[in-house]
């Protein structure tokens, strides 16, 4: 932050910390680690502590964050309470959910219990009204735009590679398969980044969500595959499929979806994951190269594993799988960051 803006931010925070939270000592702002966006977070030494956020309005959609927060909270989805907001400058005062992310708590003994709770949040989210004035639609254009990041940032920029016109044609065909798969399944509220680093484990033992300002109306399997095929932690396929089908049963029991056979649901789920992970290869590359966040490179090998695994399983993505393994994978493993995982 510039010195002037920093002072303005500090003054705003001092002014708007609610009376009930004020400690006798002078308020201090302690910087916290950021996320993949441009927001900066600070813990305030109030009683109890609060989180101050500087979220540049030219980079982040703060209106969306607030309207989605209020909509989710109205359906008992746990997100941070908002105590004050300045839309013009992008300043916010939020409830402090603590420091415990779900990711470090996950192991083979704990995962089923935690994921059951996380999946319950996804079930609650399906009860949220799909209001297009709050949640944009995850339409064909959005899905295709995301997939285009793979070529631009992963293939061209990170691997310094160019595609032949036949490769471009093949990708267009595969993207069509993935987009149709996303649009043909039942739609509901989608967090869009529902994974172990965006779920907080609170002192109350509740799970709460963060980083949901990009939520949309989209495919019913999107958040499920983001959770079960997390880009930062992997589980055996047997467990992933068992949990996915258990979730399908819960959706059907609540009548959020009509009865669908297991094979069709897993195809929705797998190909939705393939769309997400092809996109993520582009996004992680962009975060590293454009936004100076090189740590994301060491998460690429797992995402590549997911891409190869699923594309090999389905006849209509096999051509992509063969091309990726022959053309892209050798260039990827020759990168110096590959051994970091």
Label each PLM-derived region with a short phrase:
Residues 65, 111, 115-118, 143, ...:
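Hydrophobic packing residues in well-ordered alpha-helices of helical domains and bundles
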Residues 33, 37-149, 155-160, 167, ...:
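ATP-binding pocket architecture of kinase catalytic cores
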Residues 31, 38-44, 52, 125, ...:
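Active-site acidic catalytic loop and adjacent metal/ATP-binding pocket
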Residues 142, 191, 216-220, 266-274:
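Secondary-structure capping and boundary motifs in well-ordered enzyme cores
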Residues 149-158, 220-257, 271-291, 303-311:
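Active-site activation/catalytic loop segments of kinase-like enzymes and analogous catalytic loops
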Residues 282-341:
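ATP/Mg2+ or Mg2+-diphosphate-binding catalytic cores
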């Amino acid at each position: 932050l510039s010195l002037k803006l920093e002072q303005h931010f500090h003054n705003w925070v001092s002014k708007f910390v609610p009376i009930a939270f004020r400690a006798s000592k002078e308020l201090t702002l302690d910087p916290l680690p950021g996320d993949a966006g441009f927001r900066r977070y600070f813990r305030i030494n109030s009683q109890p502590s609060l989180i101050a956020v500087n979220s540049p309005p030219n980079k982040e959609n703060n209106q969306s964050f607030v309207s989605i927060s209020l909509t989710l909270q109205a359906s008992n989805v746990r997100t941070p309470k908002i105590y004050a907001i300045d839309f013009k400058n992008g300043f916010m005062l939020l409830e402090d959910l603590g420091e415990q992310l779900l990711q470090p708590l996950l192991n083979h003994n704990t995962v089923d219990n935690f994921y059951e709770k996380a999946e319950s949040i996804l079930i609650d989210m399906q009860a949220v009204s799909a209001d297009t004035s709050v949640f944009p639609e995850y339409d064909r254009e959005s899905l295709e735009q995301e997939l285009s990041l793979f070529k631009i940032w992963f293939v061209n920029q990170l691997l310094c590679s160019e595609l032949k016109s036949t490769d471009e044609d093949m990708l267009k065909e595969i993207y069509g398969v993935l987009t149709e798969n996303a649009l043909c399944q039942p739609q509901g509220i989608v967090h869009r980044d529902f994974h172990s680093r965006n779920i907080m484990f609170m002192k109350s033992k509740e799970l709460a969500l963060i980083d949901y300002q990009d939520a949309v109306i989209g495919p019913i399997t999107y958040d499920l595959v983001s959770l079960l095929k997390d880009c930062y932690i992997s589980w055996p396929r047997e467990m992933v499929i068992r949990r996915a089908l258990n979730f399908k049963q819960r959706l059907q029991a609540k009548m959020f979806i009509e009865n669908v056979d297991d094979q069709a649901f897993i195809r929705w789920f797998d190909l939705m994951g393939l769309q997400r992970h092809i996109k993520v290869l582009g996004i992680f590359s962009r975060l590293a190269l454009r936004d100076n966040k090189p740590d994301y490179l060491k998460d690429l090998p797992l995402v590549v594993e997911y891409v190869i695994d699923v594309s090999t399983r389905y006849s209509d993505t096999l051509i992509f799988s063969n091309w990726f393994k022959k053309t892209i994978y050798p260039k990827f493993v020759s990168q110096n960051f590959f051994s970091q995982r």
